[in-house]
Amino acid sequence: MSNTIETESMDEMFKDPAPVIANPESVIVELQRGLLNPATGQWQTTAEVRELNGKDEEFLASLEGNKNITYAMYVGTIVSRATVRIGDTLIKNNKSVIDELITGDRDTLLVAILRATYGPERTFKYPCEACKTSNDVTINIEEDFPIQTTTFNLREPFDVTLKKGEVLKFKLPVGSDNIAMSKGESIAQQSTLLISRCVVWKDHKDSLYSEEWAKNLGLQDRNTILSAILGPKVGPKLGEVNTQCATCSADIVINVDWVSLLLA
């Protein structure tokens, strides 16, 4: 019996400790427009995001073969999975509220998710077109994506004056508008969808005919409206990354997007 006890004691000594699963890294960020809490009528602007993990990667990979998933929907899914809260709204139980954010706020969350996942810098490989050598390219997440701000009121409908002097109110597009627009089969159809969703009618009945109304607008009025609703630039500026090849010194220009930055 004593031998059994000794053996059990030795087994206990050499057992590997149970792995400790660390809490995911989180980042706090301020949004410019934020999310309206319908219960309080207050705008919530403080958001918390976490790093992307293997579960997120597997889920997102499962969407890649789905032809019905647009880029806007895919990016929205990334944000809804990695955003913990906006104000006191927990996103895990209210994922659809991400579609109520303007594009600039959504992109601000994406930069925060990038920082939570990779730290202050993101390094990835990119081939040189001149010599075909693979280069390690490092992006400084804070410096390379400067946050644009505006004095424009991002929360209230605004006036747009049409060609014949008619004044109509419009709102800024949010995620759900961008998702609906992305399903248009042409740029013209996408413009129609966006205009029809952003016009603010005094009478709710008029909204039933918004798409047909948008189709019947003259091109000058359509362009005026699109310039107005897409005009305010807020959030991180996503553009080109310029570097040089470490082997042949040729200039390398990289057009980055959020999906490749986060998952490539």
Predicted regions and their residues:
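Short, surface-exposed, charged amphipathic helix/loop patches that serve as local interaction elements
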Residues: S2-A264
